């Protein structure tokens, strides 16, 4: 098999990342400069701050990725970069840097959809994984169920119509005064609570769609807290966290396994930051055992934003001749499968 080396850059939100990936599955380096400690002070990501920090970090992160991989830019076959979806200012930093690098080194440039990147993290973790399978992509900014028909062939089966699951986690964590990022904090606190203590709503649409809505459960938690505050009642934060988390995961589980049933597929690959959630993992693995469906997860380092997953996706794009020209622009609202 021909060995193809991809240098990948990711800067769609609050991580500046670069990686070197061979043939879409072998990671030689995966460098991440996280901005989380900075944004924590603001209770969420501040786009202008994120862009400035990407500018400060991108050059050293890319150089560190090449150094750790033990290669130079001359050894690279192509440069992969996230061009959407994400924060436009943040995306532009990585994209402009990658363009300059591609121009200077005369290497092909490959634009990558960030969601495709998350799905591709499973190709790194599970070396024998091949399409078709169903993927659940669940993170702070995205919630999708995708029928992965090929390495670049995606059918979106369900998506959120309002808040992403991870976004709801962050907002509820803020209301519970747990801090940012909210996902890991709610996951940890929920272990001490009773998941059946409070019946929070689960949104279901009448039109037979497998779309999601998480604004209702988020609002229900906020209303519950406001009522308790007005009555000057004590609340059990662990019970709230556990009950909220169960409501979110119940809906994800139901729609995900319905997709498998409708498509006749027996393999699920979960991806995105929320894929690190211990309750989600346990729930899906248990349901998978009952239904005879294989459930795959990436390692936690490959769940959150990273460039290795972008390198994997870029490789499969490159193999199918999907090379970008230097006029490619950042697309903050890029759809999965959009060319």
From Swiss-Prot:
Keywords: Acyltransferase, Cytoplasm, Iron, Metal-binding, Transferase, tRNA processing
GO (cellular component) term, any one: cytoplasm
Residues that, per the record, bind Fe cation: 114, 118, 305
Primary subcellular site in the record, as a coarse category: cytoplasm
Domain of life: Bacteria
GO molecular function: iron ion binding; N(6)-L-threonylcarbamoyladenine synthase activity
Subcellular location per the Swiss-Prot or TrEMBL entry: Cytoplasm
Record's cofactor remark: Binds 1 Fe(2+) ion per subunit.
Enzyme Commission number(s) of this protein: 2.3.1.234
Cofactor: Fe(2+)
Sequence positions that bind substrate: 137-141, 170, 183, 187, 277
GO BP terms, alphabetized: tRNA threonylcarbamoyladenosine modification
Catalytic activity as recorded in UniProt: L-threonylcarbamoyladenylate + adenosine(37) in tRNA = N(6)-L-threonylcarbamoyladenosine(37) in tRNA + AMP + H(+)
InterPro entries, A to Z: ATPase_NBD, Gcp-like_dom, KAE1/TsaD, TsaD
Family: Belongs to the KAE1 / TsaD family.
Matching HAMAP family: TsaD (MF_01445)
Its biological purpose: Required for the formation of a threonylcarbamoyl group on adenosine at position 37 (t(6)A37) in tRNAs that read codons beginning with adenine. Is involved in the transfer of the threonylcarbamoyl moiety of threonylcarbamoyl-AMP (TC-AMP) to the N6 group of A37, together with TsaE and TsaB. TsaD likely plays a direct catalytic role in this reaction.
Protein name as annotated: tRNA N6-adenosine threonylcarbamoyltransferase
Organism: Clostridium beijerinckii (strain ATCC 51743 / NCIMB 8052) (Clostridium acetobutylicum)
């Amino acid at each position: 098999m021909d060995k193809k080396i991809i240098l990948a850059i990711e800067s769609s939100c609050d991580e500046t990342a670069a990686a070197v990936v061979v043939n879409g599955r072998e990671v030689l380096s995966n460098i991440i400069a996280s901005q989380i400690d900075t944004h924590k002070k603001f209770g969420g990501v501040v786009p202008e701050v994120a862009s400035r920090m990407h500018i400060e970090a991108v050059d050293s992160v890319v150089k560190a990725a090449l150094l750790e991989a033990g290669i130079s830019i001359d050894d690279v076959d192509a440069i992969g970069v996230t061009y959407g979806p994400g924060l436009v200012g943040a995306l532009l930093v990585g994209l402009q840097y990658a363009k300059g690098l591609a121009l200077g080194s005369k290497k092909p440039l490959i634009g990558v959809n960030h969601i495709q990147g998350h799905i591709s993290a499973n190709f790194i973790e599970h070396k024998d994984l091949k399409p078709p399978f169903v993927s659940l992509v669940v993170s702070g900014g995205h919630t999708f169920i995708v029928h992965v028909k090929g390495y670049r062939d995606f059918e979106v089966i369900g998506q959120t119509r309002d808040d992403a699951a991870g976004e709801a986690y962050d907002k509820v964590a803020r209301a519970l005064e747990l801090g940012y990022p909210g996902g890991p904090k709610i996951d940890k606190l929920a272990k001490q609570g009773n998941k059946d203590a409070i019946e929070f709503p689960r949104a279901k649409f009448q039109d037979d769609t497998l779309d999601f809505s998480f604004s209702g459960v988020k609002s229900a938690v906020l209303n519950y807290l406001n009522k308790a505050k007005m009555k000057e009642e004590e609340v059990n934060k662990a019970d709230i966290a556990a009950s909220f988390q169960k409501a979110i995961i119940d809906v994800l589980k139901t729609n995900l396994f319905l997709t498998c049933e409708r498509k006749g597929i027996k393999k699920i690959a979960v991806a995105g930051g929320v894929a690190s959630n211990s309750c989600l993992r346990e729930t899906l693995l248990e349901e998978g055992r009952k239904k005879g469906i294989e459930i795959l997860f990436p390692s936690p380092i490959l769940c959150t934003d990273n460039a290795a997953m972008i390198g994997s996706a870029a490789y499969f794009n490159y193999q199918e001749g999907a090379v970008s020209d230097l006029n490619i622009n950042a697309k903050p609202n890029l759809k999965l499968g959009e060319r």
